[in-house]
Amino acid sequence: MDLIDEEKFSSEILDVYKKFVVMKQEAPDSMKVNLFTTIRNFAKDLISNKIFIEAFVLYRFLIVKSELIPDDYSTIAENLVKINAPKLAKNFMTIYATKEQNKVLMFLTLANFYNLQIGDYRKAIKYYEKYVEIDKTKAVIYSILGNLYSKVYGDSSISEQIFYFEKAYKLNPTSRLVLHALAFAYEKNRNQDKADKFYKEILNNNPTEIDYYNYGSFLISCGNFVQGHKYFRYRFLIDDENLKYPIDNSFSKKWDLVSDISDKTLLVHYEQGFGDTFMYCRFIPLLKKFARKIIFVVQDNLFDLIKNSPIISDGIEVLSDKTSVRNIYYDYDMALLDAPFVLKTTTTSIPYPQGYLTVNAPEVKTYASKYLKNKSNLKIGIAYSGDKNANYSGRDIDLKKFNIITNLENVNVYSLQVGSEIENPKIIDLGNTFNDFTDTACAIKNMDIVISTDNVILNLAGALGVKTLGLFNKQTNFRWFKTTGENVGWYNSVKPLQACVQDDWTTVFPQVVNILSEYHS
């Protein structure tokens, strides 16, 4: 009652409280039952309208004048959380658990309380699991359990997620949420057949543009480039800033990617990040057979490097994105990442896996004389952090994990990372010497080997044909369809090393050291 400011408090509710708080215990039972029911319903109406303090005043009346029913304790607890009294709320839920005789209802109420009100997801899992031991008929509860395991334990709980989502699927096989969950979980679990089954069920169940895009990405990750890139075209129909068509629709002249344009000028525009441009620019020369002329627009930081790489630029007009597309004459345009669809590329027909970008030897030599140390030591370039704005995370490695490499004898370790602070004095920072990607390429060409988890450096090193160890998390970006063997499929010079557990690199770095030791032998 100390919370009440009578000037601001609802006079109607205060009058009800004052009128009935003096009611005698010996009042007729029928009167008390009717009154308590009315008060209880009134309190719930107030709560539904988020009028919490007034509702608690009425519950106080019930506490004083009647014996609360179990539902009262849980209702009070849930709404104490809303006025920032979680400790008191938990006390009421403890009392509720002793009062509620219906075990199924009790476990569900406790589970929902800890899940939705407190955010103690581990406790929520405990009570939901007790619930499904008794009632095995609710698909939504199994689905909640699958999602909670994902939220609390991440990819280490894939088996539990699949177990509960499969239970939900058996009870409700048309639930799009469950189908999505199973497709994603099986994809993460490397069970491509099962993932494909559920993706196909999604596409037969009121599919959206993002469903087609997700399926396309999945197929690409499986190495099914032809079908994957067909569905991948749906990305531009999704409301996602990272997936926008690279040319403004108000003046774009989109090619449908199939009609004859042999007598036309085709403008190919980069999309997404630097790594994507490095990876996909290899397709530009092959597009010459489709159009009379090809114009290739790239990010300004990449312009000099690509312009001066003959495999890509011979017979191609390469332009910086500083040039407004409005001022370029052309007939049709397309996005760079659609090139594999146009070319019907397969994993065995990826062009130029040996490399296709070049820098002039004198520039490479000049860079070395300026910035590199003992030339007789093994020169190792490292990149350990990905773009924070990219669609995919999981590419960051604590720089301290590279100490096992910097402690090796007769090595010089160079950071190729831009804008990072390096505390290890054994790591030489080259990032602040990079004005554009020609500088980065010169640094990479001077390395005996590059070790990278960052897509930009990984793709650039591969495109330059430099020996590289690609460090891949357990969950990788869909473009990397091959993460075993001696190369990644895209580049002959890039050897993949993959974590067995997401974000756990303990098995990867010993492999790195073993490979580096071969260079000393």
Regions of interest found by a model, annotated:
Residues 1-449, 454-521:
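Alpha-helical solenoid repeat scaffolds of the TPR/TPR-like class and their adjacent stem/linker regions
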